[in-house]
């Protein structure tokens, strides 16, 4: 009886053990599945974080590379711009010098033209003054000659009358003058009132 009880208890314990073992196996299997799922989730999250970190690193490296390329490009542009700027500055200075040279030449040419025109104007003025003086002198001479001619023509009858009277007087004086006619001498008298260069020769009447 006791043996049967022990056997039954042993069977019951065995059944409980088997039941517990099966439950434990089931529990362990569920725990394992949960652990595997958690591991997979962790790996997936870790992989995602790693990928994100790699992407961030790649983006940072890409940004750094892009910034480096931009800096190199700006440096290259600056290095290219400096010769261009220097060349433009040199060209601007040369253009300014050329412009100033052209202005100076233009001013010199204008000055020469002005001096030439002024000289010509002065020469023309002097020639005009000389011509004016010559014309005035000729006009005065003509007026003087004309007035002299008018006076001479106006006084010509009187002069002729006076000459005739003077000739008569000279004839009378000559006729009354005592002179020796043996040597055919000629009595001469210079009349300064009539003409200074005129010499009247009156024959001596004896």
Curated annotation (Swiss-Prot):
It is found in: Secreted. GO terms for molecular function: toxin activity. Its main location: secreted. Expressed by the venom gland. Residues 25-164 form a propeptide. GO terms for cellular component: extracellular region. The keyword Signal applies. Residues 1-24 form the signal peptide. It comes from the Eukaryota. Keywords: Disulfide bond, Repeat, Secreted, Signal, Toxin. RLWRNWE repeats lie at residues 37-43, 71-77, 104-110, 137-143, 164-170. The keyword DNA-binding does not apply. Contains 3 disulfide bonds. Belongs to the scoloptoxin-08 family. This is U-scoloptoxin(08)-Cw1a. The lineage of its organism: Eukaryota, Metazoa, Ecdysozoa, Arthropoda, Myriapoda.
